Structures are given as structure tokens and as C-alpha cells.
Amino acid sequence: MAFKDNAVELEERVVAINRVTKVVKGGRRLRFAALVVVGDRNGRVGFGTGKAQEVPEAIRKAVEDAKKNLIEVPMVGTTIPHEVLSEFGGAKVLLKPAVEGSGVAAGGAVRAVIELAGVADVTSKSLGSNTPINIVRATVEGLKQLKRAEEVAALRGISVSDLA
């Protein structure tokens, strides 16, 4: 569900910058890998990675990549519709809806994704690996799994009032 229009103002946040080395015959080749999350704080978020010999260039490439991978996040008021547990690699992320006014209870990479998605109230727990790229991927995977009550009712062939 990627969006193509670049007219939307997207906020970007650098989650991680990693110095990577390739050993060649003549010595070591240094490059920088950047992980960036972009979002409009209104239900759309994406992440991207970029690699280059200079940090700003790696960030630019990552932002470009992130804009190509935007997803839509269903929300109920200021929180998510239901609890979700998602995995990617060794990372597991648990996202739970929270009451209005409780804020974003999330750490590091999860916080960046949740805030830029525009979710104001959520509780999260990172389990397993804490590698930033896998945490971000698991979080985005979890947000993709979210469904509104209307969607669930339609899939089951019943009305929303019968769902409860």
C-alpha cells in the first residue's frame, strides 16, 4: 500500500547510523548505513535504509527509500484499534492500545515509528533482539496487521454492532 504523491509534508527521524567496513586487498573501505523513519503524524509512516561513503548522503538515500514505503495506520481516536504482537528476525514487538492522555510508552526505534505515525496513546514492549532495523521492521509489520472494527465485521459478514 505505497503512496506516490510527494505533496504531503513528511517529518523524518534518523533512528540509527552505523559505520560498516568492507575489507579489500588494499585495506578497509568505510561506509555509513542509515536507518530513517518518515511520517506525516496523521496515520502514514514508512522506513528506509541507505548506505553511502558520507553520512548525509546515506541519510538522503534512506529518506528517499522510506518515502517509497509508506503504509496507512488505522487508528481509533488517538490510539490503535487492538493489541498486536509482531515478529521480524529475532525482534518481537508488542503494541497495546492505551487510554487517551497516557502518551507513547515505547522505547527507541518503536517510539520513532509510533510518533511519526501519529499515534498519541500506546503502550509497547520490545522483546528478543533489540537491533534497531529489526525492531523498526517488526513495529511496521505490527501496524500493517491492525484492522478497524468495520474491516473485521466485513470479513466475518456481520454488522459492527454484532461484533461485540
Curated annotation (Swiss-Prot):
GO CC, any one term: small ribosomal subunit
PROSITE patterns listed in its UniProt record: RIBOSOMAL_S5 (PS00585), S5_DSRBD (PS50881)
Gene Ontology BP, a term: translation
Keywords: Ribonucleoprotein, Ribosomal protein, RNA-binding, rRNA-binding
InterPro entries linked: Ribosomal_Su5_D2-typ_SF, Ribosomal_uS5, Ribosomal_uS5_bac-type, Ribosomal_uS5_C, Ribosomal_uS5_N, Ribosomal_uS5_N_CS, Ribsml_uS5_D2-typ_fold_subgr
Single GO MF descriptor: structural constituent of ribosome
Residue stretches making up the S5 DRBM domain: 10-73
Domain of life: Bacteria
Domain writeup: The N-terminal domain interacts with the head of the 30S subunit; the C-terminal domain interacts with the body and contacts protein S4. The interaction surface between S4 and S5 is involved in control of translational fidelity.
Subunit structure and binding partners: Part of the 30S ribosomal subunit. Contacts proteins S4 and S8.
Family according to the record: Belongs to the universal ribosomal protein uS5 family.
Function: With S4 and S12 plays an important role in translational accuracy. Located at the back of the 30S subunit body where it stabilizes the conformation of the head with respect to the body.
Protein's UniProt name: Small ribosomal subunit protein uS5
Species: Streptococcus gordonii (strain Challis / ATCC 35105 / BCRC 15272 / CH1 / DL1 / V288)
